[in-house]
Amino acid sequence: MAYTQTATTSALLDTVRGNNSLVNDLAKRRLYDTAVDEFNARDRRPKVNFSKVISEEQTLIATRAYPEFQITFYNTQNAVHSLAGGLRSLELEYLMMQIPYGSLTYDIGGNFASHLFKGRAYVHCCMPNLDVRDIMRHEGQKDSIELYLSRLDRGGKTVPNFQKEAFDRYAEFPEDAVCHNTFQTCEHQPMQQSGKVYAIALHSIYDIPADEFGAALLRKNVHTCYAAFHFSENLLLEDSYVNLDEINACFSRDGDKLTFSFASESTLNYCHSFSNILKYVCKTYFPASNREVYMKEFLVTRVNTWFCKFSRIDTFLLYKGVAHKSVDSEQFYTAMEDAWHYKKTLAMCNSERILLEDSSSVNYWFPKMRDMVIIPLFDISLETSKRSRKEVLVSKDFVFTVLNHIRTYQAKALTYANVLSFVESIRSRVIINGVTARSEWDVDKSLLQSLSMTFFLHTKLAVLKDDLLISKFSLGSKTVCQHVWDEISLAFGNAFPSVKERLLNKKLIRAAGDALEIKVPDLYITFHDRLVAEYKSSVDMPALDIRKRMEETEVMYNALSELSVLRESDKFDVDVFSQMCKSLEVDPMTAAKVIVAVMSNESGLTLTFERPTEANVAQALQDQEKASEGALVVTSREVEEPSMKGSMARGELQLAGFAGDHPESSYSRNEEIESLEQFHMATADSLIRKQMSSIVYTGPIKVQQMKNFIDSLVASLSAAVSNLVKILKDTAAIDLETRQKFGVLDVASRKWLIKPTAKSHAWGVVETHARKYHVALLEYDEQGIVTCDDWRRVAVSSESVVYSDMAKLRTLRRLLRDGEPHVSNAKVVLVDGVPGCGKTKEILSRVNFDEDLILVPGKQAAEMIRRRANSSGIIVATKDNVRTVDSFMMNFGKTTRCQFKRLFIDEGLMLHTGCVNFLVAMSLCDVAYVYGDTQQIPYINRVSGFPYPAHFSKLEVDEVETRRTTLRCPADVTHYLNRRYEGFVVSTSSVKKSVSQEMVSGAAVINPISKPLHGKILTFTQSDKEALLSRGYSEVHTVHEVQGETYSDVSLVRLTPTPISIIAGDSPHVLVALSRHTCSLKYYTVVMDPLVSIIRDLEKLSSYLLDMYKVDAGIQXQLQIDSVFKGSNLFVAAPKTGDISDMQFYYDKCLPGNSTMMNNFDAVTMRLTDISLNVKDCILDMSKSVAAPKDQIKPLIPMVRTAAEMPRQTGLLENLVAMIKRNFNAPELSGIIDIENTASLVVDKFFDSYLLKEKRKPNKNVSLFSRESLNRWLEKQERVTIGQLADFDFVDLPAVDQYRHMIKAQPKQKLDTSIQTEYPALQTIVYHSKKINAIFGPLFSELTRQLLDSVDSSRFLFFTRKTPAQIEDFFGDLDSHVPMDVLELDISKYDKSQNEFHCAVEYEIWRRLGFEDFLGEVWKQGHRKTTLKDYTAGIKTCIWYQRKSGDVTTFIGNTVIIAACLASMLRMEKIIKGAFCGDDSLLYFPKGCEFPDIQHSVNLMWNFEAKLFKKQYGYFCGRYIIHHDRGCIVYYDPLKLISKLGAKHIKDWEHLEEFRRSLCDVAVSLNNCAYYTQLDDAVWEVHKTAPPGSFVYKSLVKYLSDKVLFRSLFINGSSC
């Protein structure tokens, strides 16, 4: 990975050096982004401050050794062994990183002050005073704590929050933080510690005997111990002195005493036992008990420090196969001594144990051994004659360089002196090309003489071997030893006359070859350790319990799934969100839903900040009164009248606060009108705000818009005053463009330092001699502005809105009620018209000047309307009924008329939506017509930094009227308008082509002499406008300024060559610019831009095409009809092929394992075996527990093996199991519901969603209970049923709360594999007597008929009394080209989940359909608390509510309940198709519709366990709905057909033929094989193992269509 990053960076750098500037910029940006990402990643690492002074090389050592940390080197503290001391803190943090945060930790010999500073309240330090140095170190730690606290006191600070818990623990219970016992004897007892215990040992393990370490850890129940200590591999080579170069320290060994010290400085040394340290290094197992052991594992070595961990191991978890019987020798001898009089065999038996054995090996690497050899050195004492031999490591290259060279010496030259001379010369220097250079071998010079002796002896021996080899091992009369000593005597002469005798006595000659051998050392040394433990029992390996964390994770993932709908959700900080929920103890799902609701503006709350930074969120959440630092005051505080003068006096300017809604339709205005003169000489600071708007807006959207409008005035006023103050503070630094907008008057000299372009300013900002700034109302005399003595300068602005904003704020503040704006109940109608559609003309034609009011944005528009309205000579339009918006707001309450009937706002969409809401409320009108253009320039927020959320820009209206005929625009512009507007735009203009363009070479070309411009001159920007005015052009305006105006000819000019964002293909400014003229428009531009492309395209249009947009008069009405789709299925007859094995194969692939279940005797097994049932209160007649014997008729045996069950026999146990499954243990999922009111709301949605508008009210003229309805009901009954009514007098009703209970003999097959693990309970029938059905049956039959007649059958299907062909017709107009979401709601335990709320919904539906109140109350009581009696099985019980499976309303009741349930949660007005049948439902919605959390809503309101599935094809009532490009076809489920072919209840061949005919009726569509491929896809959606099934569909058709062939699917059971 590192190589890849390096290669990528190098490639990018090479790219940057190229000549392509674009590629260079991209590469530089990539490098920048990579660097930012890398620094951000480093920023997330734990931070460690390294204060000690170290060198640059040491800085690099620390950084590379600990990449897990972000280390900051301050170099502010000189200290002894500064690197090692600084690394101590890094080593501690590295050890603590290995431990889960918050787990109880023992720091053996640790620094408790370090843990306090880190805020670790879960660490206990064992710090025994083993010597005086330990006492000194402990006192130093306490001193550091006192120093830290004194610094906090001196700075007036308190202990930070993250440290507080740890310091409190040390202050109240110091023994919990630190004790002065050894770890082996520590008495600390943790309080309420449920997690695992850990330990760390930082350079303290030396002082704990290795044999006691395991037991000490077990006594504290330590799970894992992490340790760090200094060591060097060279100590294993028995070196007496070892350097630790990186930290500049050393080890020296003297026997078992090992001393650690720092070189090049005077500091205390540390002494330890070498044998004890060696045990920690070389051992692997540290026994803790006869069962548990701690196993050591090395982790890493960093800067001469070894890190390891000791893990607690339970030997009983070992696989029992590793245990074997063996004899424990110690136990054997003990037994023999204690019981010698017993037999030896008995002693052997007593000593026999089952032992567990394990072994380990550790390799130690010696990097310094590489390219080294071991050389023996010899010495002998002349005084004591004692010889000695030692070994040293010498460079392999050096050794063999010397040996190879001296091997070339002649026999006479091969002397010790010559060898020593050569060795010393190459050690001191080496000659390269005649130049002497420093030797490359750094051999200790003190060893050169001894090395030379070894080299000399080694060479002599080698010469001898060569001679022996040459002579073919024939040595004559001399032995090898004699040859050796002859050579030695010849070389040394008489130097050592007695050496030979001594060596002979010591028998050295025999080992001469071995003694002189040069060995190559191993790079690794292996240490072995063995564990032997007694096997007593075997324990299963426990699993880690992470259920709680996974549950929390599941909740968090669900919350994040909820948040995924937000924009830029991929950048959502999950860690911050999780920490927030944890710290505030908030449910993540609740928090997520609140966030989504707020961000999607569905909560009645608006957050105005764009980015949820810490500052913004803090401002949103903090107390508003505390947040008002001189400027912010929430108007919702309890004051009777908000006073602007009081606010100014306090130095405050109020913002709109929190929401409340007052629906009254009139104002009670304050009679005391504040005057603007009261704010003369108010301080500028009281108007300048740091915060642009309220952070939070609450209340209905209109209220939020109105509050935002108030804040926009405050922000505009603040910006204007702030700019004038800035001008006064720095007059000399004003640029040329700013000088054209502002003016500064020097009061002393009465001269304009900056002369303004306009005159007679009403307001300005005054700077006094005390350098104070005030807002002043300016007055004039013949000398100009009237000034005061303490004034120094006066600043004015030609764009200043101080006067108007203050006046509007004064008005709006007086209209607030307890700080809340009032929303009018008037009807608001938006008239959306294309440019030039005659909006002003329409206003004049509709207005009644005696009772209506017209408001327009500008003065020119107001004067134009007055002029046109009074053109006949009669004055009807005055300044009272035709006004500008600013005038109406500023002077509100000063005129005689305060209430108007209708309000007309021209160009209302150019206003702030909150302003429009205020205007409607202030006019007290009944209807407000807002004329505007949704595609032209909207309201533009011109205050930088002021938030105007996107949803605030949408005006809330009650109706929208469109005008799509333009009276102004020529045909070519009309063609462009059709691209921008919905609906067909036409024009009454006779001009066809009107637009043109001209590219000019530069801005200097545009001047009145060389380039006179025809007609009205327009620009896009103010800078272009000022440039044209300065060159002598007159009457120049921007496009924004002339919106709503009409000119015959227009010259549109662009002088700015840089990109302008408002010139784009879909820009509203372009639309306004193209639609101002009636005859011609010419565009002059210095650059090619999108508008040039648009004009060129319009120039190319043919006249024939433009004629299509021309009409003689405006269109009064347009009839719009939606497209209708109706198709027919393609029919391709299915070939009749296949065999029984095809059906069996397909069934086994879809439902693997079902066909292998031998379930013929399941019912018998259940009766004969013990069974435990959980039942509610019921009465059982045990005399019915044994069913009466019946003659068994052997049914036909199916050849297709399915999960079909044998018919069951009614009995106490069978019926009780069915009752438990179908009626007992009803789920209780719903929350607290206002049943009556909620049911009424649900039924409202039901009627609005499904019923035709004209049939939503019942026909009271039709009687539900009549002879005709009774006859219709009787026609559907069997004769047996009618016979039961022969003795019924219809005078009184039987008990309506009494039901009978029975079961169906045949279990229902499920199309899943549950049969393999469950005993399928039978379906129950709970039914009334026929006497009750005779009363209510006709009633509900008539109610059902009325309901079905009222349903919008084009979109909804209530599947009652429908044939499969009718289902196909209903879905036949589905258009497969329209993207759709196919929804299925799957509800389990549907009948028994229905409670009082479901009954209330159903009764309310019947009541609104005309159900008579008395009978309705009787029916309601009969379904509240009901008694069930099963006379056959002897069972009696009581149930509340629930759906009765044999009731007269079972099917239609279930159908309306599922429909009402879905209508209460989904927006049915958007639905394409919907079908309901019992508990089945199928919905088709347009693609992309948003759906609520169905499961949550169904649980809480409807008490249903439900899941909502999105599919490609629908599945409804056992049929697949296959929509295609020609319509729709309905296929019966082929798997369900095959399941039925395995039926085991067919009595005889006649019964079989009836069975075949019924299957043929439902499966007739399988004869059409045109859509088998789509059917395969639909089946695969439900059964993922299903193969393509065309072969089995054809097989089904083959057998179903031939009654003779169909008989082959069964065999006669009586013959078997």
Swiss-Prot record:
The keyword Endoplasmic reticulum does not apply. Its EC number is 2.1.1.-, 2.7.7.-, 2.7.7.48, 3.6.4.13. Residues 1380-1493 form the RdRp catalytic domain. InterPro entries: (+)RNA_virus_helicase_core_dom, Alphavirus-like_MT_dom, DNA/RNA_pol_sf, P-loop_NTPase, RNA-dep_RNA_pol_alsuvir, RNA-dir_pol_PSvirus, ToMV_Hel_N, Virgaviridae_RdRp. ATP binds at residues 833-840. Disulfide bonds: none annotated. It catalyses: RNA(n) + a ribonucleoside 5'-triphosphate = RNA(n+1) + diphosphate; ATP + H2O = ADP + phosphate + H(+). PROSITE patterns: ALPHAVIRUS_MT, PSRV_HELICASE, RDRP_SSRNA_POS. Residues 50-458 are annotated as: Methyltransferase. GO terms for molecular function: ATP binding; ATP hydrolysis activity; mRNA methyltransferase activity; RNA binding; RNA helicase activity; RNA-directed RNA polymerase activity. Residues 801-963 form the (+)RNA virus helicase ATP-binding domain. Residues 830-1085 are annotated as: Helicase. Residues 964-1116 form the (+)RNA virus helicase C-terminal domain. GO terms for biological process: DNA-templated transcription; mRNA modification; RNA processing; symbiont-mediated suppression of host innate immune response; viral RNA genome replication. Residues 72-281 form the Alphavirus-like MT domain. Keywords: ATP-binding, Helicase, Host-virus interaction, Hydrolase, Inhibition of host innate immune response by virus, Nucleotide-binding, Nucleotidyltransferase, RNA suppression of termination, RNA-directed RNA polymerase, Suppressor of RNA silencing, Transferase, Viral immunoevasion, Viral RNA replication. It holds the Pfam family Viral_helicase1. Belongs to the ssRNA positive-strand viruses RNA-directed RNA polymerase family. Heterodimer of a large and a small subunit. This protein is translated as a fusion protein by episodic readthrough of a termination codon. When readthrough of the amber terminator codon TAG occurs between the codons for Gln-1116 and Gln-1118, this results in the addition of the RdRp region to the replicase. This is Replicase large subunit. It comes from Tobacco mosaic virus (strain Rakkyo) (TMV-R).
